[in-house]
């Protein structure tokens, strides 16, 4: 099993909308998805050892599935260790909160631990502009001052950043254009684990 970082490079030119339809390209199937999760867990263990001073926080709404999956896998590898994992909502910290025509509905924050002085690993399924992570950083500081903050992303859409934010742990890197969309499916909510790139192509 090859557990090296997967990089997908795509060079597709946008076409006129009137002649476009959507095409799916599977970046990670179920098997590669699981291998990627396991690799990320091994990388976390290298840096966090027994996790006695570390906590995992999934960013609502989709990052929580990644955080839960990583926590489950870590508990299998380290059954005698206390892996602390929580969910954090960032709705009121988004920079577009008051700019949207429709009101945003906040999700639930679940963190039954203290982050003060801890090493925090923020997790999200797709890293794109970086604005979600900026909001997460601000929201997190409302709960305390961590010793260190790291970022784990299942998918890193490189070259799409609006803010200077880079992940510490990456499952898969994707070079894509703005008209393309990365969709992460989870067996818990979608019936299967998969990462798909949606691209507009000529009919």
Each PLM stretch: what is its role?
Residues 5-203:
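PRPP-associated nucleotide enzymes
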